[in-house]
Design a protein with these regions (language model features):
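Helix-loop junctions at membrane interfaces in 12-TM secondary transporters
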Residues: 68-82
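Structural signature of the two symmetry-related core transmembrane helices
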Residues: 53-68, 150
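Residue-level signature of mid-helix packing/kink "hotspots" within the transmembrane helices
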Residues: 31-39, 124-125
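Helix-to-loop junctions at the C-terminal end of transmembrane segments
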Residues: 37-50, 135
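Symmetry-related core transmembrane helices of the 12-TM Major Facilitator Superfamily/SLC fold
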Residues: 143-161
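Helix-loop boundary and gating motifs at the non-cytosolic
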Residues: 1-35
């Protein structure tokens, strides 16, 4: 996500002809959407007790938006993709954190959350750096660089589906 998101304002303004105000509105709505969804996803995760399902749903929604960005020929496409992407982010966050707590022994939870946050921060750092590297490698072809981000998004969903196991829940 960070690879695409770091390029998105430039893409919207220089390729799609959006104004800076439009970029601000799109980003504001997108981030507000993620925040609102987080409120409901935690309660839904606890109610359903199916954290893995909600995580996969959230990451899959985000993954399926990735090809929309390089295919976009209007700001409306980008807006729709950013909205769905942030719905996915909002859905996956609380269940992901709850699953970390569910599968981690109490004495290791701090370390587990620290590792999760460290990996998230690493992605936030590496995404924009890789965007620069790929922009240089692809001679500033921003759409080609966006296509690169599609691959890890779908790999992440596949890894979740294959390797993450939901713990047995008590039937209390």
């Amino acid at each position: 996500s960070e690879l695409i998101h770091s390029l998105l304002p430039v893409f919207m303004v220089s390729v799609l002809g959006a104004s800076m105000l439009t970029v601000g509105i799109i980003e504001g709505v997108a981030e507000a959407t993620a925040s609102i969804m987080k409120v409901f996803s935690g309660a839904l995760s606890d109610y359903l007790g199916r954290r893995k399902f909600l995580m996969i749903l959230g990451y899959a929604l985000a993954a399926f938006t990735k090809p929309v960005f390089p295919l976009a020929h209007s700001v409306a496409w980008v807006f729709a993709a950013r909205f769905v992407d942030r719905v996915g982010k909002g859905i996956r966050g609380a269940p992901r954190d709850a699953l970390v707590a569910d599968i981690t022994p109490p004495q290791l939870r701090g370390a587990a959350y620290g590792l999760r946050q460290a990996l998230d921060s690493a992605g936030a750092l590496l995404g924009p750096l890789l965007a620069v590297v790929f922009m240089l490698a692809f001679a500033n072809d921003i759409r080609a660089v966006m296509w690169v981000a599609v691959v890890p998004a779908f790999i992440a969903v596949a890894l979740l589906m294959i390797y993450v196991r939901e713990p047995e829940r008590d039937s209390d």
